[in-house]
Amino acid sequence: MALRSYCRQLAAQVFRLKLCGNECPRNAPGCSFSLAGIKSLHEPTGVLARSSRCVKRWHRRSWHRCASLQMPSQKSHSDTTDFSRWTLAWGAVAFSLFGGSDEKTEEQKLEDELILLLKKAKYSMMIGELDAADGFLHRAVRLAHQMHNNDAIIYTYSLMANLAFVRGQLDNAEKLFKAAMSFMLSGGTPQDDNALIEMSLKLASIYATQNKNELAEHGFQFCTDSLEAKMDKQKDLPPESLSDEERKDTRLLLGLSLDARARYLAANHRFIGACRDYRHALQICQEEQGESHPQTLVLMSDLATVLDLRGKHDEALVYVKKAVELGQAAGHPEQHVLLGNMAGILMHNGEFEESAKLYQEALALAHTAGDAEAIEQLQEGLKELDNRRNAKDNSKVEDELKE
């Protein structure tokens, strides 16, 4: 339980990509769509709803959900909220464009049709009808090409790529992400644009899933190097030329990249590098989102897990205890995962009684939450705990007999 399987962890990458379906690269140039609408889709409002694309993803990842791959039918309240905002954004655009005219031009009719197809695709994804979503998106991308509209093409390719990844069609997802990036670059988007780096991170995650380690490592390195260089450049810019949101967006994307690489390194038993990246990601998340933010707590727990695997049980306990305490105070939605990780670390440290108590508490919470995968992991942890207890008792008996 102390360390989720790599498949379980990488499932979160898939889940995040599904969530990213709402987010086309914001900085794609050449918006001839007469729809500021495409770009308005990437600007949800509200507290945390976003200082950046990463904020939402860092909040929802609860990177044990790194754990459970949720299909679109398992939508959360925030998914529904995002969809409502998305629909309202399109509705406002359509009204402003077409509400004052009785007759529409051919171009406006095509725009209407494209908007409707994308709305249908998004709704189909949300309710889990992935085949239907795929059909709508293929029709939408053909229409976008017919209109020679780069923004619409990029947005639709991005949705198609995310959908392909959710469906496990990794080769197809790779091609679609590359196609979207190609259109962005040909339109003049700079290579250090956050949207391009975000797609590069998704590609690196695909390569990691496919065990294409050289490509994965190159991709992760490109993301972190590009973002760090960009942040260095931003330090020299006058304050008025860069908004707090842009600065935060870049920094949180770096945190997300470091976290993704840390999980990749941990899965390959490269724990020193994983600890380094987790510490840096945790620092960013604490500074940008606060000590009690759900993502901060998950990163504390993840770092503790890797420290535990390195044999640094005492340091691991410091981090995981803090995560559990803050999570309890904040009402963390996946407190059972934090408790399970702490139970595993205590078990490895030989504190069997306390470990058993936490495992049972975590198991009860997991049942309440209906987290079947966590329940399975926790039950495996309890079995391991029983085995360790029995082994210790047998060893004690043998020692007594020798005396």
Swiss-Prot record:
InterPro entries registered for this protein in UniProt: TPR-like_helical_dom_sf, TPR_rpt, TTC19
Transit peptide: 1-67
TPR repeat residue intervals: 154-187, 297-330, 336-369
Pfam families: TPR_12, TPR_7
GO terms of biological process kind: cell division; mitochondrial respiratory chain complex III assembly
UniProt keyword Transport present: yes
Organism superkingdom: Eukaryota
Annotated compartments: Mitochondrion inner membrane
UniProt KW keywords: Cell cycle, Cell division, Electron transport, Membrane, Mitochondrion, Mitochondrion inner membrane, Repeat, Respiratory chain, TPR repeat, Transit peptide, Transport
SMART domains reported in the protein's UniProt record: TPR (SM00028)
Recorded GO CC terms: mitochondrial inner membrane
PANTHER family xref list: TETRATRICOPEPTIDE REPEAT PROTEIN 19, TETRATRICOPEPTIDE REPEAT PROTEIN 19, MITOCHONDRIAL
Family indicated by similarity: Belongs to the TTC19 family.
Role, per record: Required for the preservation of the structural and functional integrity of mitochondrial respiratory complex III by allowing the physiological turnover of the Rieske protein UQCRFS1. Involved in the clearance of UQCRFS1 N-terminal fragments, which are produced upon incorporation into the complex III and whose presence is detrimental for its catalytic activity.
Subunit structure as annotated in this protein's UniProt entry: Binds to the mature mitochondrial complex III dimer, after the incorporation of the Rieske protein (UQCRFS1). Interacts with UQCRC1 and UQCRFS1. Interacts with ZFYVE26 and CHMP4B.
Protein's name according to its UniProt entry: Tetratricopeptide repeat protein 19, mitochondrial
Origin species: Danio rerio
